[in-house]
Swiss-Prot record:
CTPSs have evolved a hybrid strategy for distinguishing between UTP and CTP. The overlapping regions of the product feedback inhibitory and substrate sites recognize a common feature in both compounds, the triphosphate moiety. To differentiate isosteric substrate and product pyrimidine rings, an additional pocket far from the expected kinase/ligase catalytic site, specifically recognizes the cytosine and ribose portions of the product inhibitor. Mg(2+) binds at residues 72, 140. The lineage of its organism: Bacteria, Pseudomonadati, Pseudomonadota, Gammaproteobacteria, Alteromonadales. The keyword Transmembrane helix does not apply. Its EC number is 6.3.4.2. Catalyzes the ATP-dependent amination of UTP to CTP with either L-glutamine or ammonia as the source of nitrogen. Regulates intracellular CTP levels through interactions with the four ribonucleotide triphosphates. Pfam families: CTP_synth_N, GATase. One of its GO terms (biological process) is 'de novo' CTP biosynthetic process. Residues 291-542 form the Glutamine amidotransferase type-1 domain. This is CTP synthase.
């Protein structure tokens, strides 16, 4: 199979939405029957985002094969059916790590290792390998043109453009076209300078996607075309919209997919965007609203919970309600108590690391349990629910996780001492182990208890979900917790590890050790999130009565 490559760059400012634009184009091409994948090349020196602060970088998206990746891969999976893997995201740090490892082994036969050709060759190899088996591979280059960190990646795709030829490569550049209120017009000069910068390193864009708060007038498109040496039909206006799921139709209406297909000489059907039209209709026509309190510790940056936010919205679509997320700092719960949890239709406690704010999450679980409020715990959200239950129901007053209190008399949650690395090797973990790459990661089979809410949600006796954690429920206390009324509704493939818990005599109190948000999509939703929002809606209706 001959793979075609679309390289996506960004200029003027960061956060223009390259990932959303790339994913939206991929969605249109997929709707035309093409097999599409998307890659993200990140210029930072970290080997992967696994140890980066969520408040700086946003969430870490985990792929099925256990790679810790950029949150943009979450966008990719929500827009197209192709599942991402570790070949879809790599960083400057990973490239340098692999090149230096080869140098230490002597693979380069004593050559002087340089950015060109050794680093650029390694990047090109990754890009070509990631595109294998697909009709089209869209490659997003992180950062902004002009950043020193991005230069090796830009040089690599420049070389690929020459080596593969125009019939297999296309360069798409996102820029900002701001509107100046004082002048009463949009300004194209930033775009002109951005394209000039890109051309100075040898890349001539074939398509310009112009971001702004409004559509670009035809005369300004003609001006951009003239000064940037791009066909006028290849100047695409991408205005702000109230839903990112409208963007595929917006790009389709301007013929971007036709331009790509013609450029690559591909024969394929017209795009069928009916599934996306249905998503947009559901989003615009809810029959009600629910308020979900998300009790977390990284709430100053909503992108830290990007997939959870989107999964809640998807569940709202399936239940025909709009979901309003109320972000609640878990430390605020510690300081003010239950008053900050009033007026909610459900509580969700997402994952997290470290002791800060954990008691606030435990209080949130207690409030939901005692007030029959729908509760959904994810990863740490399951662990705090179990700790709360152990303390206040099962008679273990000082129960805790050894992550937060190594001297607790009731360590109901403890460190996993054995794990499997990305190469499939069994490794031993201890307190001094590295933080990076030492977690239980990726898709794992989970057996579900017959008759449980989990089994009802999944409509079956098993599921496969993605994990990212290094602490588990301590089996020593399982029997005591079960006797107190806790249901262990999900177990690992070998039935040795607890994956899900529920509570008897509660409308909907469900928690999982895994991260179901990573597999939720706007077209398909996710059964656990759907069940949670359905329970929140039912709780609201009971309150109204």
């Amino acid at each position: 199979m001959t793979t075609r490559y679309i390289f996506v760059t960004g200029g003027v400012v960061s956060s223009l939405g390259k990932g959303i634009a790339a994913a939206s184009l991929a969605a249109i091409l997929e709707a035309r029957g093409l097999n599409v994948t998307i890659m993200k090349l990140d210029p930072y020196i970290n080997v992967d985002p696994g140890t980066m602060s969520p408040t700086q970088h946003g969430e870490v998206f985990v792929t099925e094969d256990g790679a810790e990746t950029d949150l943009d891969l979450g966008h990719y999976e929500r827009f197209i059916r192709t599942k991402m893997n570790r070949r879809n995201n790599f960083t400057t740090g990973r490239i340098y790590e692999e090149v230096l490892r080869k140098e230490r082994r002597g693979d380069y036969l004593g050559a002087t290792i340089q950015v060109i050709p050794h680093i650029t060759n390694a990047i090109k190899e990754k890009v070509l390998a990631g595109g294998e088996g697909h009709d089209v591979a869209i490659v997003e280059i992180g950062g902004t043109v002009g950043d020193i960190e991005s230069l090796p990646f830009l040089e690599s795709i420049r070389q690929l453009g020459v080596e593969l030829g125009r019939d297999r490569t296309l360069f798409m550049h996102l820029t900002l076209v701001p509107f100046l209120g004082a002048a009463g017009e949009v300004k194209t000069k930033p775009t002109q300078h951005s394209v000039k910068e890109l051309r100075s390193i040898g890349i001539a864009p074939d398509v310009l996607v112009c971001r702004g708060d409004r559509a670009i007038p035809a005369n300004e498109k003609a001006k951009i075309s003239l000064f940037c040496n791009v066909e006028e039909r290849a100047v695409i206006s991408l205005k702000d919209v109230d839903s990112i799921y409208k963007i595929p139709a917006l790009l389709r209406s301007q013929g971007l997919d036709d331009l790509v297909v013609k450029r690559f000489g591909l024969e394929c059907r017209e795009a069928d965007l009916s599934e996306w039209e249905n998503v947009i209709y559901q989003e615009a026509n809810p029959n009600g609203e629910v308020v979900i309190g998300m009790v977390g510790k990284y709430i100053e940056l909503p992108d830290a919970y990007k997939s959870v936010n989107e999964a809640l919205k998807h569940a709202g679509l399936k239940n025909r309600v709009s979901v309003t997320i109320k972000y609640i700092d878990s430390q605020t719960v510690e300081a003010k108590g239950e008053e900050v949890l009033q007026g909610l239709d459900g509580i969700l406690v997402p994952g997290g690391f470290g002791e800060r704010g954990v008691e606030g999450k435990i209080l949130a679980a207690k409030f939901a349990r005692e007030n029959n409020l729908p509760y959904f715990g994810i990863c740490l959200g399951m662990q705090v629910a179990l700790i709360e239950f152990a303390r206040n129901v099962a008679g273990m007053a000082d129960a805790h996780s050894t992550e937060f209190n190594k001297e607790t008399p009731f360590p109901v949650v403890g460190l996993i001492t054995e794990w499997i690395d990305e190469e499939g090797n069994v490794e031993q973990r201890h307190e001094a182990s590295d933080l990076g790459g030492t977690m239980r990661l990726g898709a794992q089979l989970c057996h579900l208890l017959d008759g449980s809410k989990a089994a009802q949600a999944y409509k079956g006796n098993s599921c496969v979900e993605r994990h990212r954690h290094r602490y588990e429920v301590n089996n020593k206390y399982r029997e005591r917790l079960e006797q107190a009324g806790m249901i262990f509704s999900g177990l690992s493939s070998d039935r040795k590890l607890v994956e899900m818990i529920e509570l008897k005599d509660h409308p909907w109190f469900v928690a999982g050790q895994f991260h179901p948000e990573f597999t939720s999509t706007p077209r398909d939703g996710h059964p656990l999130f759907e069940g949670f929002i359905a329970a929140a809606s039912a709780h609201q209706k009971r309150d109204l009565k």
